[in-house]
Amino acid sequence: MPKTRDNHYVPQWYQRGFLLEYSNQLHYLDLNPDTKKLPDGRIITMNDRNIWPTSRCFYQTDLYTTFFGEYINDEIERRLFGKIDDIGARAVRAFIGEDISEWHRHFSDFFSYIDSQKIRTPKGLDWIRKHYPRLGQVDLMLEMQAIRNLHCTLWSEGVREIVSAKKSDVKFIITDHPVTIYNYACSPDSQYCVYPNDPSIALKGTQTLFPLNYDNCLIFTNLEYAKNPNNQNPIEKRTNAQLVRDSMVRTDAFIRSRNLTDYEVSSINAILKKRARRYIAAPKKDWLFPETDISYDWATFKKILLPPENELYQFGGELFAKYEDGSTYYQDAFGRKRPENKYLKKTIEIKKIGRNDYCGCGSGKKYKKCCMNKKEDERSSWQVLSIRERNLVLYNGIEDILGFNKGKTWGDTRKELSNEQIIKIHELYGSLWPTDTDIFNLLPKPDKTLRALYTGLIDPRTVLLFAIGSAPYFDEILIQHPFINPGAVNPKFNPVKSPHQYKQQMLKNLLLFLYLQPFIEQGFINFFPDPCCFDLYLQREMFDMAKQRRGLIKMNEQETDRLMKIHKKDHFANTLCNLSKERRRNQVRKAMPDLSSKQIEELLQYMERQHQEDPLALLQDDVFDEGGQLTMISMVPNFEMALFIAQVTGSIILTDSETRWEELVRAQFRKNGVVSLPWVDLSDMIANQKFIFSSDPHSTLCTRMDGGFGSVRKVFREIYVDVRENKNNLDTSVERRKKEFLASYEKDIKKYNKKMNYCFNGKMNFLIPKGGFVFNNTQRLLLKSGSEKHVNNVPMAVFFKLLAP
């Protein structure tokens, strides 16, 4: 079978929809024709116009072909796009027609085809490449398939209109990137439109244009903008902007009442032409130059593209459905599955905020030190409660539920923790973090702040050492919240439905939260929820990626032993010590039958003393009367999500997990298979020093508030900025930072060596590869999440190692 190597990225069946009757050729215009330098020095422009059949238009040799040595593989063209085009052709024909039953039958295929058409063009493939550090042809084809249907949900939830050119003498043209994105606030020369970018379809003012043939053009418009175009910020994200999720929409809701004039069709053609990559085509030559027939003004095109106001009744509103099993489904106009929590909103007038007032983002910092000099899209949201503010609400609620504000102590909580309290705490947590939360709107954006994301065992006994203990060395530390979100978990494991099984875990989570609360209040620690709670597709992909990766790296033996010791200790505390005295006595007698009654009593008394002294031990001997306890070992975020969150927030990565460190080492950027470490002299110098940490959170907090280790922190921050900015005079930067580090280290160590309580020594191993840490799977997660402001890699990682006394 001959190989298909001339790949039509705009299929011929689609091109034929733009041919005039009794014609089989198109006028084909090259917007950027090749030039040739003559021997005499003159430069001439090659021919920019041709009249060609569809077979010679909009194709590129080996655009989808993959090579394995001398073997040529054309399966992407034949099997993937062959099927897509077959289904897409039927779907497009259905929506050119007016049979509503055909619309319903082909609805999903129609949207899927448009999405595939958007990413299969040279511009679409370049857009995919832009999101990855380096993609070969095979990887590019894999990633292209992995992100299909990325835009379908937001398109289907918007206003859908098909405008007609049947009464116009001018018809729609075809371009080399037919799925065209328009936002009146993002002109072609703006940062949003720098090739190969388009404004995100999640922005309120963004509209999508797709000519179905020369007589019909599909326009998608976001609902908020369509209903109130003059009072919406066009570059602000729409409500519930998550790209990949389930949604329920009407399949018959299409506006088809508008017949456009010549001027209006030419205006749409001008948009299509301006956003094309290189080639456009039309059955008549004059249609290739719409700018000659109109007054070109990018912003005013919005008037032509807005759907008629009297037809918008078909879109929006609330949707209720009942299934055969009696269960129900709810969805609002934006795809949210529960009513909006108005108590999470806040209204702040920026004009009334002074330089020294608290910043409107809720960070707890002064406005002048936080958002004052940032653009709006570089800030965390000012419209809803921040992560910090929600944590403070949660803390106040816990104080009230557990009675701390009425004199109750931690010892009382260990004795009295009840199912009702567990339910109330998790209900409060769930109300603060509804599953439709836009977490990317709340997480900090990349800037010159030295943020550090901790990834490791989330347990109050381990987090104390380095995650909290390193607070004086970094501007802000991000730690993932261990609380279970009741809105995002199977009912069998829901703490609101089955609270008893969470008693022991609740105690651990509460103690950790109490340790962290003063750091959260001061803005030193950002205690963020699991992003997967708000995006089940993200969670599913993360799990699948972790399964694929798990076979590459085994769990570190030293770490496994350490985790098993913790697990055994917890198991002992959760079982034997939480039984009634008589049952404990019987268990000891069964395990050690040679002990006398006196020895058994002495052993039980010793166990009881240890149990009383353990702050993580429940002091209830009826725990197992209602069932067992759920034991959780949470090493979060995992490898993929650690890179993901670090890139979203512009953080470096901190870990004390040997396994996670091995995973990070494997993720160093490699050029031609080789890792480059230009900062190795500096990182070796840092690794040779002993750093002071404290296992007492109060001592760590006092040190941080006193400005402790500020000189070292400043140098670390400057190193981070240097690495991110990838400065040319690297050798000079390394030498300068080495001198600054030694001076600041000696100064701070001398000052705080005897000031901190419960001190221990540790090492920080910095790993700073050129190109940072990157992983294709994480880049895909970022692309599909809709994140707009993330960095392309994680510049640095730090491994903490405890030193023997």
What are these regions (language model features)?
Residues I348, R379-S380, V384, Q421:
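Compact nucleic-acid interaction/catalytic patches
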